[in-house]
């Protein structure tokens, strides 16, 4: 609930800076508990190192409050938040990799004195992967052969470099940052491979609830950063069925539609 001078003020300032278009990048490199857990999550992008914890209450308090025995990793570890909750955007093995990730992310933001999409251009570097291989990767017209969209991106983006956003979450859509012709770009692409995760199989080329949620957040992040978006799509549609409806496919799909409709970057 609202307050003026207590901890809610910190939340308020966090949210207002975001609304003002001030980029906020956060890294969790240790335990982040209780009210403080909200602050990094309210930032535009969140990086978390393995071995860290993010939860409203730690294992000891959970045990005392509701009698539940749970490990720190199960409750709020980096892997759980990267693969299950989707709270973490990038999981890194240690502090050094987390800081390197933050530097790469910050480098993609548009300088404030330029128009949002007038990115500082770096030297164009050809893809390391052979562009000619695209012919063999993609199915012929009308074909249904699965293919790996990451392999396609490796043949399109500068130096075949791609910083993937939430790679372990909502895996039927691929989102992330790269460069094209020296300019920073965001990429939203569908994955055509069959995804096996959490004991379930997800069909490539179909948008599931988690994937829609991820893509919507990424489109918003690109607009916050002033980064143009490239869409690579070979999509059959949104997933249907009982589980999909219970997962909120309509609500979360609508979030994606809304985010793309209100996007102002090229």
Please give the residue ranges for each predicted region:
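Ligand-binding clefts of soluble mixed alpha/beta catalytic domains
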Residues: 1-266
């Amino acid at each position: 609930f609202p307050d003026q001078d207590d901890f809610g003020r910190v939340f308020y300032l966090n949210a207002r800076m975001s609304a003002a278009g001030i980029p906020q990048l956060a890294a969790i490199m240790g335990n982040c508990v209780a009210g403080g857990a909200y602050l990094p999550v309210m930032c535009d992008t969140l990086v978390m190192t393995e071995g860290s914890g993010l939860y409203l209450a730690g294992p000891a308090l959970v045990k005392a409050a509701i009698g539940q025995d749970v490990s720190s990793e199960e409750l709020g570890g980096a892997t759980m938040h990267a693969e299950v909750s989707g709270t973490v955007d990038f999981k890194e093995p240690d502090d050094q990799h987390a800081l390197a990730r933050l530097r790469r992310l910050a480098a993609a933001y548009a300088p404030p004195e330029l128009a949002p999409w007038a990115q500082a251009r770096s030297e164009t570097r050809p893809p390391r992967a052979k562009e000619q291989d695209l012919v063999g990767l993609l199915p012929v017209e009308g074909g249904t052969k699965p293919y790996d969209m990451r392999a396609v991106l490796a043949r399109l983006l500068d130096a075949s470099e791609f910083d993937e956003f939430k790679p372990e979450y909502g895996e039927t859509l691929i989102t992330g940052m790269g460069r094209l012709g020296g300019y920073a770009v965001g990429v939203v692409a569908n994955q055509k491979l069959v995804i096996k995760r959490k004991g379930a199989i997800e069909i490539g080329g179909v948008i599931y609830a988690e994937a829609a949620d991820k893509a919507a957040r990424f489109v918003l992040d690109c607009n916050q950063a002033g980064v143009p978006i490239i869409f690579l799509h070979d999509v059959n549609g949104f997933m249907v069925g009982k589980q999909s409806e219970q997962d909120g496919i309509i609500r979360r799909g609508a979030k994606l539609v809304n985010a793309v409709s209100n996007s102002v970057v090229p």
